[in-house]
Amino acid sequence: DRSIKNPEVFVKTNVLGTAVMLNCAKAAWELPDGTFKADKKFLHVSTDEVYGSLEDDGSYFYETTPYAPHSPYSASKASSDMLVKAYIDTYKFPANITNCSNNYGPYQFPEKLIPLIINNALQGKKLPVYGDGKNVRDWLYVEDHCKAIDMVCNGGKIGEVYNVGGHNERPNIFIVKTIIAQLHDRLKDDGISEDLIKHVADRLGHDRRYGIDPTKIKNDLGWYPETPFEKGIVLTIDWYLDHEEWMEHITSGNYQKYYEEMYKNK
């Protein structure tokens, strides 16, 4: 959402920022003969959004899927991926790229769907859902993602790209209704119900479906997502219920201004 309102910030951060990081790493790690220190590797963490959108036909994103970004954010990430690939090809720079699906879990900033819905429901606020709510995302629990990153850092072949997916495809409206049901059952609060759901105008450039095939990282490194969504969402809700003070702190000030601006006409 932020990239739609202010794309320049994302270009500066994701494109120019990646270029700065690459240049700094190259300067620090390059040896006089043009090779690089053997114990160094640059890991570029990217997104499945660079691949565009999938139809609801059982297809998946693979490492060989052509890039087709649809938003300023995904275009900036695609550009940064290409920069890393260019350094690998041009300088034999020691790097890997990972493209992951939607993360969720503890400490996620509340502009993201799952913490946003949890926070709003606890406060009795409306739960904004874009369009018909049937956009599908592949949900990856954050600890599973961290394990994948560790495996790629320590075992990934230089120059390779690895897709990291959760095998947990769910429509957004399913996510929202699941959170409502979980909170209602735990808190015995009749105010937390599906009546809070408010469908709002669809987001510009909103991709319909994402789905990653993680076969390559499974075969090469032995990684596979361990956390089914039904378990991960319980762990996530537990964490936010146990850390309401953190949520109150993080949603004050600048975030509150952003939230009000984003949804003021919806």
List each language-model region with its residue ranges:
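Hydrophobic alpha-helix immediately C-terminal to the catalytic Tyr-X-X-X-Lys motif of short-chain
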Residues: 79, 83, 87, 117, ...
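A glycine/serine/threonine-rich, flexible loop-to-helix segment
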Residues: 57, 110-118
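Residues that scaffold the ATP/ADP-binding catalytic core of kinase and kinase-like folds
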Residues: 53-54, 106-107, 220
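Nucleotide-sugar-dependent glycosyltransferase donor-binding/catalytic pocket residues
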Residues: 11, 106, 138
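A general lysine-centric signal
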Residues: 41, 77, 112, 216-218
